[in-house]
């Protein structure tokens, strides 16, 4: 995404860089300052004590209960349909550019991006609320030197794309 952003300057690329680095810091950073190798694929759900992808999947009734604004557009944007369910649940992923969402809602791209951010905030809050019935997967505490070295390279690329975000300092801290 860093190289793509340097070539094309699409906001989606910059957002993806920022969100990915934030996720790494929040979920994968170890007390040592290095980054963990992996998360367990399985986590408990209300239906199963060990379900692959359980923390990251949503039932349609859970999504409906969130009372998200523009729910039909939400379902379209994240490809929630009877054909996209995985074992009866949904893995939310963007299937359309923000421009298409703006056109669908008949609003400008900034307002569409605001809608997307609101949906993400509601989903994050709902994830926090269901943490007892669907806890986060366990993090493997192992830190691999080679993978942390790749992260240094990735952070350096992110710094070239977005030099004011401090990614260079993060990369140097791993050296």
Predicted regions and their residues:
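Aromatic (Trp/Tyr) and acidic
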Residues: 1-174
């Amino acid at each position: 995404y860093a190289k793509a952003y340097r070539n094309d300057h699409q906001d989606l690329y910059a957002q993806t860089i920022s969100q990915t680095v934030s996720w790494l810091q929040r979920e994968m950073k170890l007390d040592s300052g290095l980054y963990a190798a992996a998360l367990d694929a399985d986590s408990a759900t209300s239906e199963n004590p060990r379900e692959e992808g359980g923390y990251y999947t949503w039932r349609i009734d859970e999504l409906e209960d969130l009372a998200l604004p523009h729910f039909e557009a939400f379902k379209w944007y994240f490809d929630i349909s009877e054909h996209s369910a995985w074992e009866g649940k949904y893995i939310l992923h963007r299937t359309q550019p923000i421009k298409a969402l703006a056109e669908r809602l008949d609003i400008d791209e900034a307002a569409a991006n605001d809608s997307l951010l609101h949906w993400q905030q509601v989903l994050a809050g709902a994830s926090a609320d269901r943490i007892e019935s669907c806890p986060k997967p366990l993090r493997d505490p192992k830190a691999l030197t080679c993978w942390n070295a790749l992260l240094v390279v990735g952070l350096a690329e992110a710094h070239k794309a977005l030099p004011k975000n401090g990614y260079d300092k993060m990369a140097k801290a791993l050296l």
